[in-house]
Amino acid sequence: MHIRLLCYGVITLVVKVTSIFHDWPKYLPNSPKKQISVMPEHATLLSLDVGWEANNVKSQNLLSHVTALLDQAGVADGAFHHAHSGTHLLRHTTTTDLNATIYRPLLCLILQGAKQVGSSTRTLTVGAGQSLIVSHTLPVISRITEASSEVPYTALVFPLDLDLLRSLAPAVPPVISGPSSDPFSIGQCDTDPGLEDALYRFFVQCEEEETRQLLAPITSREIHARLLIGQQAKVLQRLLWHESAASRIFLATRHIQANLSETIVVGDLAARIGLSNSAFFEQFKAVTGTSPLQYQKDLRLLKARDDLRTSRAKVSEVAFAVGYESSAQFSREYSRKFGRSPRQDRELEPIN
């Protein structure tokens, strides 16, 4: 009986409260006679429009912030290392010729314009609103394909923390269950609005010492987590899956980088990561877009170019330091790759 009375009382209360909310306008002074209308049928379309606008605002916020940072740094054309965030910001007002460089594990957001990037066997074109994710250290060829003074090519490069990715991986649902049909270590996708928002917050947090120390690391963790569950999660999960070709080749590339001046013995390197010579060569090319020997040669030449522009060592000393036994061979291969002799390159400004 008591329970029945209690239930009756609750139902009565709910009915009264509902009635009050339904008639709420008449309790307000000078309230309009018009009642609240039922949600129209086009509300779903309206919500989609609002969502698109919100995503567009996030993109514009990030572009405006990066542009302001470049302006403050006085960089009208070129690259800028933003020390507080650890990122690199880029702006170009004209298209560029092909340029050889090294990509390390990174996220690159194209905010305006477009660029082309690739290896000797693969080429990708990525434009505004898209991102590149690079899982391995790679020698690449790139060029800016869309840029003008009115709409300059603008991008940001966010370096990836592989240790942080590995710590997050166990909590992430796997999107792969075996080797991928395309293990290439550069992935391309549309930029996720949530990722743009996190990057914008990261930049803002890096402006003040207190938020840079307390909040920015948390947001950096969020950015890495979003990459593991986003559109290009496969690129990074392949790297973190220890039985994948990407993971094994990562070990091989790391060995080559650490022993750059030493001669590569393919059989020894293949055995080090548990592959036959033929499987190693095939998987290495699939992941990096080049052969082991060409990979080492490209890294040697790029390292030599940096050394020439940042030190006063003789050309022959630079050549021997990166593993060349012949200064003449070094000069020939250097000129073939960069279109300039080592001595000519020494006169140029350091590359950012």
Q: How would you describe each model-predicted region?
A:
Residues 2, 23, 27-30:
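Intrinsic-disorder-associated, low-complexity terminal segments enriched in Asp/Asn/His/Tyr and depleted
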Residues 10-25, 37:
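N-terminal amphipathic/hydrophobic targeting modules at extreme N-termini
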Residues 23, 79-177:
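N-terminal regulatory/effector-sensing and dimerization cores
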Residues 222, 226-232, 239-241, 257-259, ...:
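Basic/polar phosphate-binding segments, predominantly the helix-turn-helix DNA-binding elements
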Residues 255-259, 306-310:
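Short alpha-helical segment immediately N-terminal to, or the first helix within
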